[in-house]
């Protein structure tokens, strides 16, 4: 878009701006009072999810105007372009085809003359062979012992997605197989890895090196340390050439879009899994990057995860905008950020299995839409992605809910919970106790969203209270209920947020599939590391950076 045709100049945007002037002082409690059936009109179901958007500060008229904005941005055509494999990642001139990773084997998707589905399922078949070999106790280390621990070495999308899903689906770990424990190490300082290396048996430890480019310094630093650890303990420090070869073959799997770099590093081609340049890192858990998930829950459950995401893909593609879950979720965010000036967003799962979901969404949303330049290179004169953070809701109640209830910031909240849990606990007494705990958790989830909406009016007594015991309410929130937390509903939940991000990016006219800010950080860090090591070139830096380096060098000289 040129400056004159940017979305904020559109009739739909201008109509929303005018409409917002009359909505800013409207309290949520009055919206429910003035229109019976408000909840039903702003609630939708799909793919095992119930999406309640009724606690946002909007009316039917608001949604009608937001849908007009989406159509003004050609959203329906954008959805087609995304799922058809057109080049929607404009800065890198390629498709963004994470949806292809969850297509069923009988599907066909021809992208630039090539059907990508067979390659996707060939990779899944290779993953399955590796998983079955581990679960049969047949993947053996250099000494012939079966692998018992798998450590995923990755960062960002190669870590957060697999970590989140593996934790969320821990209940689905297969019980009739050789047990393999899954671990994650991402920090470049080596602290996570160091803990594992003091506790694990090198003879039974397998490392998965996950890096799209296979140049990420965080991952390769950990990988080099892991390799040296194995060589020292299993191959006489690497001097035993025969054992060195066996160690490299049996203790490393590589996952990357760059097979030649995996081979250069020493990973056996038979133990390499590939993915493609058209899959962004933060969208990659659906393919080979998801190997730790498959090792944790088995391939059958991994395929159910894909099926749930694909169900949401079809919903996103085929459902009219006014009933489309990702579209409606995205429009609620657009309304809050761009028209009500709500620029903070908290993710609050009420289920301990979703402990890492907020961290996962931090990357998905802020790395995707934390942009200030349009696809045509114009500076955006409007806000884009809000600051997003979160924590398990029950814990957050004792951490930052004080700010939500009585602070000065307007914050949009997403409450997420499964409706049913613990149905399959065998012992009746234990099942009853756990179900009571789940009921308590659901009560807190619903109650907190109610208090954030109503403020003082949620309290049973209308007796006068001092100011420090007053609650203003009027904080917007979404409540997402899963029928159950299963591989299928989790897949749908993740895909829901992926598509929400795409909808917002389309309206803001930004590219959600690049991350040039991340690339700049890597470049500057590499240059700084060279100066730190050589003690030359500090004069090119700013005064603060030179001062900090001096502190480090003085400490090094003192030891």
Swiss-Prot record:
CDD domains, per database record: SIS_PGI_1, SIS_PGI_2
Compartments in which it is found: Cytoplasm
Transmembrane intervals: none
Chief localization: cytoplasm
Catalytic residues identified in the record: 367, 398, 522
Keywords, ordered alphabetically: Cytoplasm, Gluconeogenesis, Glycolysis, Isomerase
PANTHER family: GLUCOSE-6-PHOSPHATE ISOMERASE
Annotated function: Catalyzes the reversible isomerization of glucose-6-phosphate to fructose-6-phosphate.
Protein name, per record: Glucose-6-phosphate isomerase 2
Organism: Chromohalobacter salexigens (strain ATCC BAA-138 / DSM 3043 / CIP 106854 / NCIMB 13768 / 1H11)
Protein's gene: pgi2
């Amino acid at each position: 878009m040129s400056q004159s045709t940017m979305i904020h100049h559109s009739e739909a945007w201008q109509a929303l701006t005018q409409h917002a002037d009359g909505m800013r002082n409207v309290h949520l409690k009055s919206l429910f009072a003035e229109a019976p059936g408000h909840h039903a009109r702003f609630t939708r179901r799909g793919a095992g999810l119930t999406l309640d958007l009724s606690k946002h500060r909007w009316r039917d008229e608001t949604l009608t105007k937001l849908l007009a904005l989406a159509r003004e941005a050609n959203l329906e055509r954008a959805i087609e372009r995304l799922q058809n494999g057109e080049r929607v990642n404009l800065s890198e001139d390629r498709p963004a085809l994470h949806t292809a990773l969850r297509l069923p084997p009988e599907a066909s998707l021809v992208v630039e003359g090539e059907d990508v589905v067979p390659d996707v399922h060939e990779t899944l078949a290779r993953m399955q062979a590796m998983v079955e070999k581990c679960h049969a106790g047949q993947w053996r280390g250099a000494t012939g012992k079966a692998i018992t621990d798998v450590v995923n070495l990755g960062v960002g999308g190669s870590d957060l997605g697999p970590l989140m899903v593996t934790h969320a689906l821990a209940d689905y770990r297969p019980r009739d197989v050789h047990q393999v424990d899954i671990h994650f190490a991402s920090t470049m300082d080596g602290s996570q890895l160091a803990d594992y290396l003091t506790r694990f048996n090198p003879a039974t430890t397998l490392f998965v090196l996950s890096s799209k480019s296979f140049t990420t310094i965080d991952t390769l630093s950990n990988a080099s340390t892991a390799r040296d650890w194995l060589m020292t303990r299993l191959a006489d420090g690497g001097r035993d050439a025969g054992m060195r070869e066996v160690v490299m073959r049996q203790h490393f799997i590589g996952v990357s879009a760059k097979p030649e770099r995996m081979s250069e590093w020493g990973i056996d081609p038979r133990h390499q899994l590939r993915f493609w340049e058209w899959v962004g890192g933060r969208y990659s858990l659906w393919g080979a990057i998801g190997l730790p998930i498959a090792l944790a829950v088995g391939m059958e459950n991994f395929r159910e995860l894909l099926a749930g995401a694909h169900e949401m893909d079809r919903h996103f593609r085929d459902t009219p905008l006014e009933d489309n879950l990702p579209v409606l979720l995205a429009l609620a965010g657009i309304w809050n950020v761009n028209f009500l000036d709500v620029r903070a967003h908290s993710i609050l799962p009420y289920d301990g299995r979703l402990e890492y979901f907020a961290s996962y969404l931090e990357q998905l949303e802020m790395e995707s839409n934390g942009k200030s330049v349009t696809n045509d290179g114009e500076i955006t004169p409007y806000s884009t992605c809000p600051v997003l953070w979160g924590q398990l809701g029950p814990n957050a109640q004792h951490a930052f809910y004080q700010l939500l209830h009585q602070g000065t910031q307007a914050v949009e909240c997403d409450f997420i919970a499964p409706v049913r849990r613990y149905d399959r606990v065998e012992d009746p007494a234990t099942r009853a106790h756990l179900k009571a705990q789940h009921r308590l958790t659901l009560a807190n989830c619903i109650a907190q969203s109610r208090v954030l909406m109503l403020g003082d009016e949620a309290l049973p007594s209308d007796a006068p209270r001092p100011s420090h015991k007053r609650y203003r309410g009027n904080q917007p929130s979404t409540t997402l209920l899963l029928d159950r937390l299963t591989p299928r509903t989790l897949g749908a939940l993740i895909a829901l947020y992926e598509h929400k991000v795409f909808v917002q990016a389309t309206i803001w006219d930004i590219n959600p599939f690049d991350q040039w800010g991340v690339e700049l950080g890597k470049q500057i860090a590499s240059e700084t590391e060279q100066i730190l090591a050589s003690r030359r070139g500090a004069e090119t830096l700013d005064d603060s950076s030179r001062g900090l380096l001096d502190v480090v060098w003085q400490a090094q000289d003192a030891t």
